[in-house]
């Protein structure tokens, strides 16, 4: 089973690497996609080399999607293909896990209206304005969408994602 992570520069380091390694511990294959194959650098300086570009992503090859936070989602969401990938995962009912600023991509995918969600407090108003039902909790699961607020919530975030993937 494969999981895809979307990332650009200034991702929140822990929010990319914690799920990447935690999912690998569960025996899942995890790939990182970006707008190019150039090394991406997190806010704290950790680096990741993307495995593929957004253009090369075939959603049917993946069981789930992870969207780390930091400033990366601001960059990912302006890429039309990346937003299309998010929409495709949602339309196929596949798990989509977004943490911190990650839900910005769900806003761009027009996928938050009426959905229970959480996020970093700095984008709470954006989610509410887009129609989300905001909850200030470590993790919120609404159907196939998992959201969390910050790095401290990663154990809950990954735990819920793994539970859902095991049912998939």
Curated annotation (Swiss-Prot):
Domain PfpI endopeptidase: 1-166
NCBIfam families according to UniProt: PfpI
Record PANTHER family: DJ-1 PROTEIN, DJ-1_THIJ_PFPI FAMILY PROTEIN
Family note: Belongs to the peptidase C56 family.
The protein's name in its UniProt record: Uncharacterized protein AF_1281
Species per Swiss-Prot/TrEMBL record: Archaeoglobus fulgidus (strain ATCC 49558 / DSM 4304 / JCM 9628 / NBRC 100126 / VC-16)
Classification of source organism: Archaea, Methanobacteriati, Methanobacteriota, Archaeoglobi, Archaeoglobales
């Amino acid at each position: 089973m494969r999981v895809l992570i979307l990332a650009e520069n200034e991702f929140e380091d822990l929010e990319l690497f914690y799920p990447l390694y935690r999912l690998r511990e569960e025996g899942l294959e995890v790939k990182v996609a970006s707008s190019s194959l150039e090394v991406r650098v997190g806010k704290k300086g950790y680096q990741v080399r993307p495995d593929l570009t957004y253009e090369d992503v075939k959603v049917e090859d993946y069981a789930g999607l992870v969207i780390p936070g930091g400033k990366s989602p601001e960059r990912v969401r302006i890429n039309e293909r990346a937003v299309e990938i998010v929409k495709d995962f949602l339309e196929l009912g596949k798990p989509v896990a977004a943490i911190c600023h990650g839900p910005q991509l769900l806003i761009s995918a027009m996928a938050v209206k009426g959905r229970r969600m959480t996020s970093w407090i700095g984008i709470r108003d954006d989610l509410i304005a887009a129609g989300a039902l905001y909850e200030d909790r470590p993790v919120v699961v609404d159907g196939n969408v998992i959201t969390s607020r910050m790095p401290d919530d990663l154990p809950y975030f990954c735990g819920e994602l793994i539970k859902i993937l095991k049912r998939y």
